Amino acid sequence: MRHQCRVPLLGKPADQRKALLRSLTTELIRHGQIMTTKTRAKAVRSEVERMITLAKDGSLAARRRALGYMYDKQLVHSLFADVQSRYGNRNGGYTRITRTLRRRGDNAEMAIIELV
């Protein structure tokens, strides 16, 4: 049984949710930090950590899994190239979520998620 193994649904159908998480993951790795809602930041954190762990593995199978998930091929190659120098001795905890002011239009909790 899958009790308490709930993924954040983000108020979207499964295909839109997967596309949103892929897009946020790609943009976070590209820019180093993004501002989004707190719930989306918490949801994308596990995906980003998974991509960085794949890059630390460095095998061909890991590279192909990352290419299948992220939207930018060049970004995957650059991630695999510089991840050992940046996160070589760190065992997880590659991201930091900082809460910021609420969004003006709908008062949603906003957060900045960044790579450490």
Swiss-Prot record:
GO biological process, one term: translation
Cellular component per GO, a single term: cytosolic large ribosomal subunit
Domain of life: Bacteria
PROSITE patterns attached to this UniProt entry: RIBOSOMAL_L17
Keywords assigned by UniProt, alphabetized: Ribonucleoprotein, Ribosomal protein
Disulfide bond entries: none
UniProt key word Ribonucleoprotein: yes
Ribonucleoprotein listed as a keyword: yes
Gene Ontology terms, MF aspect: structural constituent of ribosome
Family the UniProt entry places it in: Belongs to the bacterial ribosomal protein bL17 family.
Quaternary structure, from the entry: Part of the 50S ribosomal subunit. Contacts protein L32.
HAMAP family: Ribosomal_bL17
PANTHER family, per the entry: LARGE RIBOSOMAL SUBUNIT PROTEIN BL17M, RIBOSOMAL PROTEIN L17
Protein name (record): Large ribosomal subunit protein bL17
Gene this chain is encoded by: rplQ
